[in-house]
């Protein structure tokens, strides 16, 4: 019994000790878990703080960048607005100058009218006085005759009238002759004064057009890239533009040679962009030439708009403005046609102001008098006929149309402005150094060479190059075969020999190119 109690006591004691140890172990485990959880939470908090700081820093940087972009946009917009305001101010100043000139012209007209009125009053007084003197003289002679001669009153009256009539006829003839001589002297002096004044006020520098352009290179290594493998790049550019590329020993420079200023400018723009881009191969060259051609159209329109704005001309058809811009790339006897037209417009305006005519209309007619020269190399007909058709097409006034038709004496001028423009045209063209016959003949020969080639069937376009020593003819591959290309070259050669006079030899090159293009999708 005692043993059983002892065993039971030991068991109970063991249970109590085990329970105490279990409680202590679980408490320690809880404390360790709590420490781990505390450390984990602390780590999460630190990580969250770091991420929050980084996010805050990124947000601050983005805000600064956004602020900088916004400020840049605002500054750019302000700059554009200032530029627009400046342009508007310049236009207002120019309009004020035009109005001032109009006021001056009106004042001059008023002065002339006042002088004429004063002269008329003076002449009227002289005539009245002469009539009174004649009446007194007639009366004296009548009385004298009645006293001396045994004449009746009607007989005496008839005698006196006959004598007076003869005297008056003689005096009138003398006065008319003196007036004519004085008028001629005055008119010649006034005309010379007006022309001299017009030339001085419209004096313009004139430089004879050249047939070459120079493109600067960053280094001489670029010449090899422009030439390309086996010369394919230079051949592609010459074929697309019709301009000769001359690459010689000149350091860091390439020369573009061609008689057509538009094609030469397109070639220059394309080559400069290729050099700047660095990628020079046939496909890229073709892309740049197309882009330069489009940019050239925009540049031509901008030139036309600038010209009519400078001259104070308004309400002109956009296509006619573009045609005016094309005159900048046409020459007549070596004289730039656009500069010549501007000079004629200014001289016409000055002469019109002196004579009391419409200054703006005179400038408009003067500017458009050679407008046909912008298209005479594309359409058959003289520049006078083409100019008349263009101005009628774009609803220009009858005065402008008649001015164009009559400025070379083909038709009768119907207005004072038409006569003034013809005179201004003669003044601009006849002054020393304005024109050069040799350059005009040279360009005409090259244009004729291209026209002969373009007359044949299947020809897409042709270019006269090498100063007229070679003509390259590009044909449609679906219309002209390889065998027909050989025959075409011979036919063109024979027609050139029959219709054109030239020194040396002319090489005829027919180019037939076939392309097969597919797109992989």
UniProtKB/Swiss-Prot annotation:
The chain crosses the membrane at residues 1-21. Its EC number is 3.1.-.-. InterPro entries: HD/PDEase_dom (IPR003607), HD_domain (IPR006674), HDIG_dom (IPR006675), KH_dom (IPR004087), KH_dom_type_1 (IPR004088), KH_dom_type_1_sf (IPR036612), Ribonuclease_Y (IPR017705), RNase_Y_N (IPR022711). The keyword RNA-binding applies. It is a single-pass membrane protein. GO terms for molecular function: RNA binding; RNA endonuclease activity. GO terms for cellular component: plasma membrane. PROSITE patterns: HD, KH_TYPE_1. It comes from the Bacteria. Its main location: membrane. It is an enzyme of class 3 (hydrolase). Pfam families: HD, KH_1, RNase_Y_N. Residues 211-274 form the KH domain. Residues 337-430 form the HD domain. The keyword Hydrolase applies. GO terms for biological process: mRNA catabolic process. It is found in: Cell membrane. Keywords: Cell membrane, Endonuclease, Hydrolase, Membrane, Nuclease, RNA-binding, Transmembrane, Transmembrane helix. Belongs to the RNase Y family. Endoribonuclease that initiates mRNA decay. This is Ribonuclease Y. The gene is rny.
């Amino acid at each position: 019994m005692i043993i059983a109690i002892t065993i039971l006591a030991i068991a109970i004691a063991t249970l109590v000790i085990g329970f105490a140890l279990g409680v202590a172990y679980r408490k320690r485990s809880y404390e360790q878990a709590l420490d781990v959880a505390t450390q984990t939470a602390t780590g999460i908090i630190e990580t969250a703080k770091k991420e929050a700081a980084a996010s805050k820093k990124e947000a601050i940087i983005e805000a600064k960048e956004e602020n900088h972009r916004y400020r840049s946009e605002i500054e750019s917009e302000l700059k554009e607005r200032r530029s627009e305001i400046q342009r508007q101010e310049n236009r207002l100043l120019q309009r004020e100058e035009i109005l001032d000139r109009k006021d001056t012209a009106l004042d001059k007209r008023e002065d002339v009218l006042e002088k004429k009125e004063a002269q008329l009053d003076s002449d009227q007084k002289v005539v009245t006085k002469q009539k009174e003197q004649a009446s007194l003289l007639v009366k004296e002679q009548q009385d004298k005759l009645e006293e001396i001669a045994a004449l009746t009153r009607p007989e005496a009256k008839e005698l006196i009238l006959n004598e007076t009539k003869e005297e008056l006829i003689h005096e009138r003839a003398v006065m008319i002759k003196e007036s004519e001589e004085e008028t001629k002297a005055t008119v010649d002096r006034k005309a010379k004064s007006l022309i001299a004044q017009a030339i001085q006020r419209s004096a313009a520098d004139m430089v004879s057009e050249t047939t070459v352009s120079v493109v600067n290179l960053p280094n001489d290594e670029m010449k090899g890239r422009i030439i390309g493998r086996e010369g394919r790049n230079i051949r592609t550019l010459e074929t697309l533009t019709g301009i000769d590329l001359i690459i010689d020993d000149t350091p860091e420079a390439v020369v573009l040679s061609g008689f057509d200023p538009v094609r030469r400018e397109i070639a220059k723009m394309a080559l400069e962009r290729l050099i700047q881009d660095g990628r020079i191969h046939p496909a890229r060259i073709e892309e740049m030439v197309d882009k330069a051609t489009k940019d050239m159209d925009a540049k031509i329109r901008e030139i036309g708009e600038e010209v009519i704005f400078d001259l104070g001309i308004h309400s002109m058809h956009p296509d006619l403005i573009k045609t005016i811009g094309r005159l900048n790339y046409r020459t007549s006897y070596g004289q730039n046609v656009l500069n010549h037209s501007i000079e004629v417009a200014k001289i016409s305006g000055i002469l019109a102001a002196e004579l009391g005519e419409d200054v703006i209309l005179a400038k408009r007619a003067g500017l458009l008098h050679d407008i046909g020269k912008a298209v005479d190399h594309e359409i058959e007909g003289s520049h006078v006929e083409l100019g008349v058709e263009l101005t009628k097409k774009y609803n220009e006034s009858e005065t402008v149309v008649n001015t164009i038709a009559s400025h070379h004496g083909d038709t009768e001028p119907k207005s004072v402005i038409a006569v003034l423009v013809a005179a201004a045209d003669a003044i601009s063209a006849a002054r020393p150094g304005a024109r050069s016959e040799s350059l005009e003949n040279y360009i005409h020969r090259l244009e004729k060479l291209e026209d002969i080639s373009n007359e044949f069937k299947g020809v897409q376009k042709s270019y006269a190059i090498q100063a007229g020593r070679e003509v390259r003819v590009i044909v449609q591959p679906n219309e002209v075969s390889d065998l027909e290309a050989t025959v075409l070259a011979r036919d063109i050669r024979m027609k050139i020999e029959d219709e054109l006079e030239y020194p040396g030899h002319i090489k005829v090159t027919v180019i037939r190119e076939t392309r097969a293009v597919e797109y992989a999708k």
